[in-house]
Amino acid sequence: MGISTRPSTEDIQALARELQALRGQIQSISSQCSEYGITIGSLSAQDPAKPVYRSLGNILLEVDDRDSLLEELKSAEKALTEHLARLAEREESIRKKYEEMAEQFEME
């Protein structure tokens, strides 16, 4: 916003675009978290006698240390979950600001 207290349509549109981009990020990160959860569950339920493979680029490598892989997956899932929480907080903040700006715009 400029010197005026009344928000411009450009200000409101910029916030709407930012909000839309954040929602896209939240959806993407949420899907990734879900995939990690499924992978962790599958790995935990896997018969220890059966080999487990990990994708590295275009090749599959057999995993020697399942516990290490499981901890790595859990750590990545936790990091994504924390990032998701921060994005949700940011979304809420921007949504409130958007609503306030839209209300100010309509009043004047």
Segments (PLM) and residue ranges:
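Short, charge-rich amphipathic alpha-helices with coiled-coil/heptad character
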Residues: 1-20
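Short, basic/low-complexity N-terminal boundary segments at the transition from targeting/disordered tails
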Residues: 20-41
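Short amphipathic alpha-helical/adjacent loop interface patches that line ligand
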Residues: 19, 33, 77, 84, ...
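Non-transmembrane, heptad-repeat alpha-helical coiled-coil rod segments
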Residues: 45, 89-108
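Amphipathic alpha-helical coiled-coil segments
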Residues: 26, 70-90
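Charged, heptad-repeat coiled-coil alpha-helices that serve as long linker/dimerization "arms"
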Residues: 29-30, 46-49, 84-85
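A structural signal for alpha-helical segments
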Residues: 7-10, 24, 31, 68
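Short coil/loop "hinge" linkers that interrupt or connect long alpha-helical coiled-coils or helical hairpins
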Residues: 42-68
